[in-house]
């Protein structure tokens, strides 16, 4: 059997498939998206974890030992900042968040040599812009940041203890140079 987990904006879904690809079981659990200020969209990563555990338990119910593989999908845009202990420093800033609109103008004003390798359309909820916003508006939190993850990559860390991403998710952060297949500091150094 194979387990699929999708970390959505307001809920997590778990799906158990048999070896023949047919659905054996499915479960979903909701979690809150808070908007402490108009235009902000945040969720505490601990909520994702708690509801993922519940959804997986409900879906696998006594069949966990039969699971041969796990696939993750979910929010690629968004920002989870971790401290030295690899724990979140604040609620995650989600893809729908609009607080970094001023940072969009700043990015678009950068020299093409910095902007073009990022190879993406720009939206306020992208991790690079949210990180710029954090640097300006929550400097103590920003100073404590040791790792930056997408929501889905944070869930992978919670499940496995491993920090990882893949190029398609990394490219959506505005912190990744697609042509060089590596992290770009241009936006944060500008």
Residue locations for each model-derived region?
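N-terminal glycine/serine-rich phosphate-binding loop of ATP-dependent small-molecule kinases
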Residues: 1-90, 144
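Glycine-rich phosphate-binding/catalytic subdomain of phosphoryl-transfer
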Residues: 57-190
């Amino acid at each position: 059997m194979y387990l699929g987990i999708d970390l959505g904006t307001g809920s997590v879904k778990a799906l158990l498939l048999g070896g023949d690809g047919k659905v054996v079981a499915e479960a979903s659990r909701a979690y809150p998206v808070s908007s402490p200020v108009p235009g902000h969209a945040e969720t505490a990563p601990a909520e994702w974890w708690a509801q993922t555990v519940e959804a997986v338990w409900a879906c696998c119910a006594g069949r966990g030992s039969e699971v041969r593989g796990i696939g993750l999908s979910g929010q690629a845009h968004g920002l989870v900042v971790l401290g030295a202990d690899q724990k979140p420093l604040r609620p995650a800033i989600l893809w729908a968040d609009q607080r970094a609109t001023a940072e969009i103008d700043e990015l678009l004003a950068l020299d093409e040599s910095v902007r073009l390798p990022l190879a993406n359309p720009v939206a306020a909820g992208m991790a690079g812009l949210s990180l710029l916003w954090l640097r300006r508006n929550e400097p103590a939190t920003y100073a404590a940041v040791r790792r930056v993850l997408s929501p889905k990559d944070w869930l992978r860390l919670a499940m496995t203890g491993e920090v990882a991403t893949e190029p398609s998710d990394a490219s959506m952060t505005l912190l990744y140079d697609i042509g060089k297949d590596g992290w770009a500091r241009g936006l944060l150094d500008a």
